[in-house]
């Protein structure tokens, strides 16, 4: 998420794409130290909330370490947070219902979710949201 915003002079087209197409705005780096997030109840019924998720924030031989996760915000009324960092309740994930498509953006790499079962569940929920009519 920070690749677009975290520059001395962010590219205006990239910022507009993130906000107007993807539905998110950057909230800052180093959003969490614990590597723990949770989903929250929203109007998106496919992602019901109350799922605790751990992403890798330590050195590991299985997956790389997330050293500086991002906090992100919904950029408009079409977007909403669906995930927060456990330690401070900053937004860790945003979903968006756009005209003709859906988006989901995380403040950390999806592949660093430690539990395969939780990773599979979240992917299913996101894909169900993408396929939904409402």
What spans do the regions from the language model cover?
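A glycine-rich, often tryptophan-bearing local segment used as a flexible ligand/cofactor-contacting loop or short
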Residues: 1-59
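Residue-level preference for alpha-helix termini and adjacent loops
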Residues: 4, 49, 63-65, 72, ...
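Extracellular ligand-binding/catalytic regions of CAZymes and related secreted enzymes
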Residues: 9-32, 75-80, 86-134
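P/S/T/G-enriched low-complexity
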Residues: 39, 66-67, 128
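Alpha-helix initiation/capping motif
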Residues: 42-48, 68, 75, 98, ...
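Long, C-terminal catalytic modules of enzymes
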Residues: 52-63, 68-70, 76-84, 92-98
């Amino acid at each position: 998420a920070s690749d677009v915003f975290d520059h001395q002079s962010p590219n205006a087209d990239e910022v507009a794409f993130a906000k107007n197409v993807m539905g998110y705005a950057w909230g800052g780096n180093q959003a969490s130290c614990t590597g723990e997030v949770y989903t929250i109840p929203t109007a998106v019924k496919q992602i019901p909330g109350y799922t605790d998720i751990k992403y890798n924030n330590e050195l590991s031989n299985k997956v790389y370490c997330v050293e500086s996760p991002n906090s992100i915000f919904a950029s408009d009324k079409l977007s909403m947070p669906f995930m927060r960092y456990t330690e401070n309740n900053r937004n860790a994930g945003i979903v968006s219902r756009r005209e003709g498509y859906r988006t989901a953006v995380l403040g950390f790499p999806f592949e660093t979710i430690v539990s395969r079962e939780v990773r599979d569940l979240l992917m299913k929920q996101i894909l169900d949201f993408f396929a939904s009519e409402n």
